[in-house]
Amino acid sequence: MTTISSFPSIFVPLVGLVFPAIAMASLSLYVQKTKIF
């Protein structure tokens, strides 16, 4: 049960850092592809 209790401490920063990075990258690629700006 130690790994389950320590899982959120690793999972939360991972989601908090990786998900915005993927969102920013996909957004920048979408803007470059569509050439809106």
UniProtKB/Swiss-Prot annotation:
GO CC term, one of those recorded: photosystem I
Gene it is expressed from: psaI
Organism: Gossypium barbadense (Sea Island cotton)
InterPro entries, A to Z: PSI_PsaI, PSI_PsaI_sf
Subcellular localization(s) per the UniProt record: Plastid, Chloroplast thylakoid membrane
Domain of life per record: Eukaryota
Family: Belongs to the PsaI family.
Keyword Plastid: yes
Keywords for the protein's UniProt record, in alphabetical order: Chloroplast, Membrane, Photosynthesis, Photosystem I, Plastid, Thylakoid, Transmembrane, Transmembrane helix
Annotated PANTHER family: PHOTOSYSTEM I REACTION CENTER SUBUNIT VIII, PTHR35775
Record-given protein name: Photosystem I reaction center subunit VIII
Protein's membrane topology: Single-pass membrane protein
GO annotation (BP), single: photosynthesis
Regions crossing the membrane: 10-30
Protein task: May help in the organization of the PsaL subunit.
